[in-house]
């Protein structure tokens, strides 16, 4: 039995029910699935599993604005309203949440990793609704556990921050996940391939830039780089990064976008990547056929305005699933 795991029992869709797939919405199509069901066998074809990670403990430790613990429900509510465009050949299963208010951050990350591995064993593409960006390390661990030690797994992070802070003194938090991945790779004698899109110089100290400069597998583009380059050049940079790689894990920190587009985040930004450009870049990553799982993190509903941020996060999920399904 999976620890800290609670299957979904509540629908987030409250509109009319229509049997016609031409007018169906996500909330009408999504089906509940219990990962603890021992009778399940691997699915055939391309299907997705949606799981919430109800933790912002890492945000609290990192002195951020807490509230991301509420985001899985907020994102599901927005996603449920969207039209369904994929017929009956693709399924999105809502498998529930990882939740443990009295559990440590490390315990919850470990529980998430086991749930992710279970999804992969069932041939389901994981979609994780964070939670703080501590979500990423648990998601990454689960993906790695589903692979052999020699298999590659590149990481693309759309984020204003590197999240490569050392954690030997403070312990893990929402700003250390990718340093933990880096350290795991070093211990396993693997190159950590990591590309950050949307870095803001005023949000990252010189130690982090120096660490990146000395690390062979790490690349980044600032938000200003992306603005100047346009989506086509950004996509070419991603292609170069993914050359020779078979798998990529994608994580989207909603603080990559300015407060005008994403007011409800743990760490607001005055500058940020254009969401329209982001959709084009995300679609390009999804079309690569290398994407094995993705998450959206750091939505903080108590700080949101008219669900703008939750809706934007749901929009990214919509387009990623569309393109992954069409290119499967």
From Swiss-Prot:
Record keywords, A-Z: Histidine metabolism, Hydrolase, Manganese, Metal-binding
Superkingdom, natural source: Bacteria
Cofactor binding note from Swiss-Prot or TrEMBL: Binds 2 manganese ions per subunit.
Single GO MF descriptor: agmatinase activity
UniProt: Mn(2+) 1 binding residues: 133, 159, 163, 253
Entry-linked CDD domains: Formimidoylglutamase
Pathway: Amino-acid degradation; L-histidine degradation into L-glutamate; L-glutamate from N-formimidoyl-L-glutamate (hydrolase route): step 1/1
Binding site for Mn(2+) 2: 159, 161, 253, 255
Pfam families for the chain: Arginase
GO biological process: L-histidine catabolic process to glutamate and formamide; L-histidine catabolic process to glutamate and formate; putrescine biosynthetic process from arginine, via agmatine
Cofactor(s) annotated in UniProt: Mn(2+)
E.C. designation(s): 3.5.3.8
Catalytic activity: N-formimidoyl-L-glutamate + H2O = formamide + L-glutamate
Function: Catalyzes the conversion of N-formimidoyl-L-glutamate to L-glutamate and formamide.
UniProt similarity note: Belongs to the arginase family.
Protein name as it appears in the record: Formimidoylglutamase
Species whose genome carries this gene: Streptococcus pyogenes serotype M12 (strain MGAS2096)
Gene designation: hutG
């Amino acid at each position: 039995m999976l620890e800290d795991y609670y299957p979904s029992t509540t629908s987030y869709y409250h509109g009319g029910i229509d049997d016609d797939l031409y007018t169906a919405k996500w909330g009408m199509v999504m089906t509940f699935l219990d990962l603890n069901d021992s009778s399940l066998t691997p699915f055939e074809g391309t299907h997705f599993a949606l799981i919430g990670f109800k933790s912002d403990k890492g945000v609290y430790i990192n002195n951020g604005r807490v509230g991301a613990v509420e985001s899985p429900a907020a994102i599901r509510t927005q996603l449920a309203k969207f039209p369904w465009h994929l017929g009956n050949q693709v399924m999105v299963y809502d498998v529930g949440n990882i939740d443990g208010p009295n559990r440590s951050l490390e315990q919850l990350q470990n529980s998430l990793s086991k749930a992710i591995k279970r999804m992969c064993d069932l041939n389901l593409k994981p979609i994780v609704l964070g939670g703080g960006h501590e979500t990423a390390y648990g998601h990454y661990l689960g993906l790695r556990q589903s692979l052999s030690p020699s298999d590659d797994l590149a990481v693309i992070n759309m984020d204003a921050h590197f999240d490569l802070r050392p954690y030997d003194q403070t312990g893990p938090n929402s700003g250390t996940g990718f340093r933990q991945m880096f350290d795991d790779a070093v211990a396993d004698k693997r190159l950590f391939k990591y590309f950050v899109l949307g870095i803001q110089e005023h949000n990252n100290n010189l130690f982090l830039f120096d660490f990146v400069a000395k690390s062979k597998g790490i690349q980044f583009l600032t938000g200003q780089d992306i603005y100047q380059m346009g989506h086509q050049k950004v996509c070419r940079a991603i292609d170069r990064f993914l050359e020779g790689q078979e798998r990529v894990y994608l994580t989207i920190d909603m603080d990559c976008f300015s407060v005008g587009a994403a007011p409800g985040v743990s760490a607001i930004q005055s500058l940020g990547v254009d969401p329209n450009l982001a959709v084009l870049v995300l679609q390009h990553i999804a079309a690569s056929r290398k994407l094995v799982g993705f998450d959206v993190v750091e939505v903080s509903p108590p700080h949101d305005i008219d669900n703008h941020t939750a809706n934007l996060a749901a929009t990214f999920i919509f387009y990623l699933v569309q393109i992954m399904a069409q290119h499967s």
